[in-house]
């Protein structure tokens, strides 16, 4: 019966993976591999910079909690936490450089930056990225990165400055100022640490999202900073 059905028609079942692809596929795979090799240094730098920037920001967050709570025991670790948080400017500069390398097209860590993906007339149009483009667009993204870096840089500079001055003057006014700036950083960190986890890390794959990701990111770096 089967011989009658297939009579006159030759069927060939691929025996291995090499028969499933053609020369055009090899070219596409080569392009993809080249793209990955090109991005490897940038992805490694982003991972390291984000890790240590997060640790230093969490160290300042922990220190600010002690100042806001008027804790006395933390005086023995104050200078240690301030030293750890001193990496914020360095990590911030590295993250800014990576941001502008991606915006300039030198690095390609964030494929949502490709304008073709949000252009309805493009053959590469992605409806999911189009819907997210109100948040994931280059101008707004750069503004947010600047807020994270400059804001964290300002708070670590200000808190360390007031803390050092308080050691010298023992002035109640400086004590109150240290409290106020610490409370300000706690509020800033609460919003910024969530948003920079989205921007620097989760937006690498903008089709995937998790409501718990920001907590994993913050708690991981906070535990490391301690």
Could you tell me what each predicted segment is?
Residues 1-5, 58-62, 100-104, 191-200:
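Alpha-helical transmembrane segments of multi-pass membrane proteins
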Residues 2-40, 117-123:
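Low-complexity, proline/glycine-enriched hydrophobic segments characteristic of transmembrane helices
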Residues 37-54, 79-82, 212-218:
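Loop-to-helix transition at the N-terminal end of transmembrane alpha-helices
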Residues 43, 132, 137-226:
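Long, contiguous internal "core" modules enriched in hydrophobic/ aromatic residues
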Residues 53-71, 152-156, 160:
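Central hydrophobic cores of alpha-helical transmembrane segments in multi-pass inner-membrane proteins
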Residues 68-83:
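Flexible loop linkers connecting adjacent transmembrane helices
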Residues 84, 88-158:
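Intramembrane catalytic core of multi-pass membrane enzymes that act on lipidic substrates
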């Amino acid at each position: 019966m089967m011989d009658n059905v297939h009579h006159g028609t030759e069927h060939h079942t691929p025996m291995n993976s090499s028969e499933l692809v053609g020369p055009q596929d090899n070219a596409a795979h080569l392009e993809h591999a080249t793209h990955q090799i090109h991005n490897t240094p940038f992805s490694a730098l982003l991972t390291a910079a984000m890790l240590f920037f997060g640790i230093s920001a969490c160290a300042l967050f922990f220190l600010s909690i002690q100042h806001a709570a008027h804790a006395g025991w933390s005086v023995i670790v104050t200078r240690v936490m301030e030293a750890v948080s001193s990496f914020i400017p360095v990590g911030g500069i590295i993250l800014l450089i990576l941001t502008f390398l991606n915006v300039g097209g030198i690095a390609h860590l964030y494929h949502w930056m490709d304008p073709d993906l949000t252009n309805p007339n493009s053959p590469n149009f992605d409806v999911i990225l189009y819907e997210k483009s109100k948040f994931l667009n280059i101008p707004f993204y750069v503004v947010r990165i600047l807020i994270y870096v400059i804001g964290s840089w300002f708070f670590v500079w200000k808190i360390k400055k007031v803390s050092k001055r308080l050691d010298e003057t023992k002035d109640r006014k400086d004590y109150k100022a240290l409290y106020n700036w610490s409370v300000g950083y706690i509020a800033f960190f609460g919003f910024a640490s969530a948003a920079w986890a989205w921007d620097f890390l989760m937006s690498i794959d903008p089709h995937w999202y998790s409501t718990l990701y920001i907590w994993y990111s913050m708690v991981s770096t906070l535990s490391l900073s301690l």
